[in-house]
Amino acid sequence: SSAASDVYKRPVRESLDSVYAAHAAGKHLADDPLFKTIEPATLLYINYEALCAKTSHPAVGMAALLPCFWVYDGLGQVFVKAQKKSRLQKNPFADWIAGYGSPEYSAEVRQALGIADALAAETDETVKAEMTSAFLTACRMELHLMEAAWRGLTWEPVAKPH
């Protein structure tokens, strides 16, 4: 459906907008070490979402994307409340994170959930089971992504051959 297509395209548009904004501000992301390498947990997660979206029923692809929307909506809500009570306003990512706690973003999340429900209603039990599996796997990957960031997990250095 067109609405599902829009939900798939939104994160891509946001990412491109961020790159363009950084470039317009004179920041060159290619020079930033944070952007030189995609970390393992991120690579695993985005490839899993892409695999589900590309090779599975559209409902399964949508289910694989939902944890990202839903988790960030919840985290955004918590952050907005915490921001009012603490020094989190000084966090350099405060505005970006607070955007995930906005009523507009929550409305988009509800739209994504509605699309997933509508897609599920049109499928059989086999596809619904695949949706559940994709959703739970993506939830685990979301947790792993955050844990990896918290613990600073990255690629192991590759030794040069002697």
Regions found by a protein language model. Name each.
Residues 129-162:
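Acidic, carboxylate-rich catalytic segments that either coordinate divalent cations
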Residues 72, 79, 115-122, 138, ...:
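Hydrophobic alpha-helical segments
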Residues 1-8:
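Short, small-residue-biased leader/transition segments that mark boundaries at the very start
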Residues 9-107, 140:
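Active-site-proximal alpha-helical scaffolds that flank and shape metal-associated catalytic sites
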Residues 102-136:
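Long amphipathic all-alpha helical oligomerization modules
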